[in-house]
């Protein structure tokens, strides 16, 4: 089977190695598309020359791969994969959409679709996918974070900020974590899918130049006709990798749930109480605790697959 993959390979790292090793495991012939200098310029990438990158790539492949391998120049996003020259393509989650576009082109030209093999991200110890940009910017070396980790929480609530910072410190406490707030507006009293959409919107709007955008939203959802209060967290990083987490949802007491159609849930909590959870538990469980649980859950997938 002929397997293809592509990239710029400006700085060869553990993520590239995972892709190349997978391609060499699957195929008896591997075709590696290497971004041309012109294509790199069009994408705004300041990289070494094609010939220099090709030489480094050839040396690396010789160390890890024992099947026939060809390096070809890529002048567009699709390369030889769109013309029928390959049987399968190895991609990362970041480039999976390109593979789908290639298959659309192939089907349009009556060429059998490629088998798409997705290789998971290889993460640095900050939970963010390793990339040449992060290495060249001096943020990571050998998979280890060497600069402060900047977290931007999409909120004006100090409670949400504290919940996010505590969760990050608990799981990534070996890093220098800096946490700021970015006020983000979402619809009041979200319910159902609005809770998830609101969390994602907060994460996207807060990211900016930070390493993580954190979106936390809470609202009423229904499970089998039962009104529940759920806290949701969306974590979006500077590489575009999005992960999710929720805190345990709990049932809203029936006498309160009956009033939800015309009364915001916050107005059902007696004055002076921190939250519905705190009111029901007599302070044993707080809103901050539940939000921290949601952020912690969203971080868990990022602890797997670290270099």
Question: Each predicted region: which residue ranges?
Answer:
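Anionic-ligand binding patches
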Residues: 189-307
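Nucleotidyltransferase catalytic core that binds NTPs
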Residues: 1-151, 160, 170-176, 185-189, ...
């Amino acid at each position: 089977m002929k397997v293809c993959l592509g990239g710029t390979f400006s700085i060869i790292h553990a993520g590239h190695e995972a892709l190349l090793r997978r391609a060499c495991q699957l195929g008896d012939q591997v075709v590696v598309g290497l971004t041309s200098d012109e294509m790199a310029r069009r994408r705004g990438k300041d990289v070494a020359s094609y010939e220099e990158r090709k030489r480094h790539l050839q040396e690396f492949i010789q160390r890890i791969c024992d099947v026939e391998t060809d390096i070809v120049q890529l002048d567009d996003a699709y390369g030889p994969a769109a013309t029928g020259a390959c049987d399968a393509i190895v991609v990362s989650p970041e480039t999976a959409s390109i593979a789908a576009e290639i298959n659309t082109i192939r089907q349009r030209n009556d060429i059998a679709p490629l088998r798409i093999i997705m290789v998971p991200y290889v993460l640095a110890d900050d939970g963010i996918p390793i990339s040449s940009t992060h290495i060249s910017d001096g943020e990571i070396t050998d998979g280890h974070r060497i600069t402060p980790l900047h977290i931007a929480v999409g909120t004006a609530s100090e409670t949400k900020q504290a919940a996010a910072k505590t969760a990050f410190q608990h799981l990534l406490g070996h890093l220098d974590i800096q946490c700021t707030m970015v006020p983000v507006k979402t619809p009041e009293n979200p319910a159902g899918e609005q809770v998830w959409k609101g969390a994602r919107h907060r994460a996207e709007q807060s990211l900016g130049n930070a390493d993580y955008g954190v979106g936390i939203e809470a609202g009423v959802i229904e499970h089998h006709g039962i009104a529940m209060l759920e806290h949701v967290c969306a974590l979006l990083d500077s590489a575009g990798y999005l992960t999710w987490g929720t805190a345990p949802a709990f049932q809203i007491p029936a006498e309160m749930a009956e009033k939800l159609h015309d009364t915001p849930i916050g107005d059902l909590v007696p004055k002076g109480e921190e939250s519905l959870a705190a009111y029901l538990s007599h302070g044993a469980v707080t809103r901050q605790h539940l939000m921290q649980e949601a952020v912690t859950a969203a971080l868990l997938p990022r602890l797997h697959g670290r270099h």
